[in-house]
Amino acid sequence: MSVNLINIGFGNIVAGNRVIAVVSPESAPIKRIIQEARERGMLIDATYGRRTRAVIITDSDHVILSAIQPETVSHRLSGEDGNR
């Protein structure tokens, strides 16, 4: 079983086969998911202090914040972008 590694910005990499969803952080339900993950200790902030542009939800219930656009993460997951 090969692991598909995806660059989510600033040298941070996630296992693509563990990603369930890549969403925008603006909606109230996503903000609630982020807050609940923070309270459970399951939030990973990979923004390096920059604005959160994508929220990545994994099958292990981890929530990862990224400073790159959801569309960019999606392209990298689908293999259309060589920036892995």
Swiss-Prot record:
Listed InterPro entries: RemA-like
Lineage: Bacteria, Bacillati, Bacillota, Clostridia, Halanaerobiales
Protein name, UniProt field: Putative regulatory protein Hore_09800
Family classification: Belongs to the RemA family.
Source organism per UniProt: Halothermothrix orenii (strain H 168 / OCM 544 / DSM 9562)
